[in-house]
Design a protein with these regions (language model features):
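Extracytoplasmic/periplasmic terminal helices and flexible tails
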Residues: 9-13, 28, 37-40, 46-47, ...
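Short extracytoplasmic
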Residues: 4-36
Length: 111
């Protein structure tokens, strides 16, 4: 399974993939998709997990404030499931902490 993100900053191969806080796989590769020029994240999901719906969403999350980046999956309501090689299109990119701090400082400075 793969997912396309606007920004995959800080995510690397072997990062964990979770569902409801439980690790169900790992990131196998992070690259640029040649068609969309978005960050493409390939994931290996445990074979026991065969219930990811077509409308599953993926978010790049951070463990703690400055911790490791990982993928969090959320299952949708669709009854059909993702096949091997499917691409998750409903994604939330990494929150870049430097951008967030910069925005807070700008706002505090009377911006």
């Amino acid at each position: 399974v793969s997912a396309l993100f606007d920004n995959a900053a800080g995510l690397s191969p072997r990062a964990r993939v979770t569902l409801s806080g439980v690790t169900i796989g790992e990131v196998t590769a992070v690259s640029i998709d040649q068609q969309t020029l978005m960050a493409k994240v390939d994931m290996a999901i445990d074979s026991q997990v065969d219930y990811l719906s077509l409308d599953t969403s993926a978010s790049i999350l951070t463990a703690g404030l400055l911790g490791e980046k990982y993928i969090g999956l959320s299952i949708g309501a669709d009854e059909e499931t993702l096949n091997d090689g499917a691409i998750i299109e409903d994604t939330q990119s990494a929150l870049v902490i430097e951008e967030l701090v910069g925005q807070v400082l700008l706002n505090l400075g009377g911006g």
